[in-house]
C-alpha cells in the first residue's frame, strides 16, 4: 500500500506564486492561455471548486486535487508555480488526466484551503473539473496538418457560453 510522503517543502507565499506566474509573457500564434488571477478566499467559486475538483483518496485524511485547465493549456510560469505546489502540498508529482487536466495526489485534507488559495493566485483555481464545464478540445488547425477547423476557438466559445448558464450545467450532472 502506498504511504504519504514524509517530508514536504514549505508552501510558497502568495506573492511568490504571483511572481512566478507573471514573470513570463505568453506569446505566439493561435489561442494562448489567459491567466486569471483570483483571490481564492471563501466564496461561491471556492465552494464549487471544493465540490468538483477535490476527491478523497482511499488513505484517510488525504485527497487528490484536480487542476482544471482551460483547453488543456498552462503557461511556463503556471508550470513553475504548480511544481512548487506539488512539492509543498503533494508528493512532488503531477499527473495528467484524459480530460486535459492535472492531478496532485497526497494532499492533506486540512491543507486544501491553502493549496486552493495558491492555485487561484496562479490562475489555476478553475472549478468544474470533470463536468460539462470542463470542455476538452483537440489542437485543430492551430497545429494539426489534418485539421480543417479551429476546434480550440469553438471549444472556448462553448465553455464561455456554458459559464453563462449555471442552471444548465447543474442539470447535466446526472447525465
Please tell me what each predicted stretch does:
Residues 1-175:
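Peripheral terminal and linker regions in Fe-S/redox and tRNA-modifying enzymes
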Amino acid at each position: 500500500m502506498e504511504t504519504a510522503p514524509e517530508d514536504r517543502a514549505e508552501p510558497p507565499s502568495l506573492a511568490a506564486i504571483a511572481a512566478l506566474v507573471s514573470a513570463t509573457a505568453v506569446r505566439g500564434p493561435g489561442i494562448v492561455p489567459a491567466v486569471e488571477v483570483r483571490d481564492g478566499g471563501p466564496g461561491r467559486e471556492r465552494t464549487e471548486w471544493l465540490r468538483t475538483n477535490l476527491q478523497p483518496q482511499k488513505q484517510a485524511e488525504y485527497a487528490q486535487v484536480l487542476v482544471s485547465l482551460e483547453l488543456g493549456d498552462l503557461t511556463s510560469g503556471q508550470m513553475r508555480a504548480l511544481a512548487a505546489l506539488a512539492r509543498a502540498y503533494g508528493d512532488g508529482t503531477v499527473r495528467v488526466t484524459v480530460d486535459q487536466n492535472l492531478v496532485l495526489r497526497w494532499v492533506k485534507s486540512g491543507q486544501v484551503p491553502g493549496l486552493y488559495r495558491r492555485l487561484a493566485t496562479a490562475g489555476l483555481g478553475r472549478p468544474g473539473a470533470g463536468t460539462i464545464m470542463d470542455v476538452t478540445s483537440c489542437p485543430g488547425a492551430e497545429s494539426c496538418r489534418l485539421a480543417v477547423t479551429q476546434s480550440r476557438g469553438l471549444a472556448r466559445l462553448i465553455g464561455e457560453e456554458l459559464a453563462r448558464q449555471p442552471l444548465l450545467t447543474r442539470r447535466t450532472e446526472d447525465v
